[in-house]
Design a protein with these regions (language model features):
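ER/Golgi luminal nucleotide-sugar-dependent glycosyltransferases, focusing on the catalytic module
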Residues: 2-351
C-alpha cells in the first residue's frame, strides 16, 4: 500500500534554481514540514577546509542572552558547515563560567573561550585577534607569537562577528522547503556571505542612519579585504588612533569609535555596505543624499522604520533583549519560534 501511494504521489516538479528551471523528484510526505536549517540534510563537501571564522560574543547581561545563544547553537552549529566557531564567554567579576552549564557544542570546530568582561564586542574581538591569531597584515608577528597563536586569518574567506543580544536565524518555511529540495550547499550564513563581492565588503541584518549610515554591529560579515580595512590602525574613518578593535570604556565610545568607523572605512575605501532590509537594496550610502535615510532613526526601535517595526523573516536576526523599545520584533520572533515548535510537537504532516 505504501509503495503504491509513493508511486502515485512521487512526481516531477518545476523549480527555479540559480536563474533556470530544473525538474526535481521528491516524495512530498514528511513527518512535519521543515521549519529551520536544523531540519535540512545538506550535502557536505569534506574536501573543503573551513573558510569562515565566526566570533560570537556572549555576555549574560540580560534575561534572554542564554536563550539567544542556545537558539543559535541548536539551529546553526553543525559539523561540516565550513565554519570555525569561537564563542567568547564574557566573565562577570572575572569569575570563570562553568562551560558544562552552557549549550553543548557538538561540532568539532566549535569552541568556548573565556574572557573578562571589561571590553565591549569590538574590544573583545580585538583581544581575540591579539591572543589567538596570526596573519594580521598590520602587525609583525615574532616567532614566539607564531608559536603561541594558532589561527591564521589568511585561511578564511569570510568573517562573521555577532553577539548574544539577538535571536535568529528566522527563515520562512517556504524558503527552507526550497533549500531542502534544491540539493545545493546553502547554509544559514549564505544569505549574508553571498552578498559579499567585489563591490560590497560589509554586510549585516540592518543599516541604521542614526548619526551616519552604518551596518549595525550586532551582526557583521566581511571578507579578507574588508577585515584588512577594519584592522588597520589609526584614526581613519573616525576611529581612535588605536583602531576599531580597541577596548573602549563605554558603549557610547564603542558606537562612536568602532561601530560607525567600521562602515565609514569601507565606504571611504570605495566599497559598499549592505543589509537585508528591502528598502536599502542597491543604495550607495557614500552619496550625500543617502546619508539622511529613515530620518536618522535607529530601525530596530519599535515603529521607527518608516512607522513599522522590523520583521524577523526579512532581517533574519532581531534584537532580543529586555528593552521595551525592541519588544515588537522580539514579540514577533517569539511567536514564530512558538509556531515552529508547535509544528513538531503536534507531529503535523506535510501534504
Amino acid at each position: 500500500m505504501y509503495s503504491f501511494m509513493k508511486d502515485q504521489y512521487e512526481q516531477k516538479q518545476l523549480k527555479f534554481i540559480n536563474g533556470t528551471f530544473e525538474r526535481i523528484r521528491h516524495f512530498p510526505f514528511r513527518r512535519y514540514p521543515l521549519t529551520s536549517f536544523e531540519d535540512v540534510t545538506v550535502r557536505r563537501d569534506k574536501s573543503v577546509n573551513n573558510d569562515i571564522l565566526l566570533i560570537y560574543i556572549y555576555a549574560g547581561t540580560h534575561s534572554h542572552a542564554y536563550g539567544n545563544l542556545k537558539y543559535f547553537i541548536e539551529k546553526c552549529v553543525r559539523q561540516g558547515d565550513h565554519v570555525d566557531y569561537y564563542f567568547i564567554l564574557q566573565q562577570v567579576d572575572n569569575k570563570p563560567i562553568n562551560e558544562s552549564d552552557m549549550p553543548l557544542l557538538t561540532s568539532k570546530t566549535a569552541y568556548y573561550i573565556q574572557h573578562e568582561n571589561k571590553c565591549y564586542d569590538f574590544g573583545t574581538i580585538g583581544w581575540f585577534f591579539d591572543h589567538y591569531t596570526i596573519g594580521n597584515p598590520w602587525k609583525n608577528n615574532s616567532l614566539v607569537d607564531k608559536t603561541n597563536r594558532k589561527i591564521n586569518l589568511n585561511k578564511y574567506k569570510y568573517f562573521i562577528f555577532m553577539n548574544s543580544s539577538i535571536r535568529g536565524p528566522f527563515f520562512p518555511p517556504y524558503f527552507i522547503e526550497l533549500v531542502s529540495k534544491s540539493n545545493i550547499n546553502y547554509y544559514w550564513y549564505s544569505i549574508f556571505t553571498n552578498r559579499i563581492n567585489n563591490y560590497v565588503k560589509l554586510v549585516g541584518c540592518t543599516i541604521s542612519c542614526e548619526t551616519v549610515p552604518h551596518v549595525q554591529s550586532y551582526l557583521l560579515v566581511t571578507d579578507l579585504i574588508g577585515l584588512s580595512i577594519l584592522l588597520k590602525p589609526g584614526n581613519w574613518g573616525g576611529a581612535y588612533p588605536e583602531g576599531i578593535f580597541t577596548c573602549y570604556p563605554t558603549k557610547d565610545h564603542v558606537s562612536l569609535y568602532s561601530e560607525l568607523p567600521s562602515s565609514n572605512r569601507i565606504l571611504e575605501s570605495g566599497y559598499m555596505i549592505d543589509s537585508l532590509l528591502t528598502k536599502y537594496q542597491h543604495i550607495n550610502f557614500s552619496e550625500p543624499h543617502n546619508k539622511f535615510c529613515n530620518s536618522n532613526k535607529n530601525p530596530f526601535i519599535n515603529n521607527a522604520f518608516q512607522g513599522t517595526s522590523l520583521e524577523p523573516y526579512e532581517v533574519v536576526f532581531v534584537k532580543y533583549n529586555d528593552f521595551e523599545w525592541t519588544k515588537d520584533s522580539r514579540g514577533r520572533a517569539q511567536l514564530y519560534e512558538k509556531w515552529n515548535n508547535d509544528i513538531k510537537l503536534v507531529n503535523r504532516s506535510s501534504w
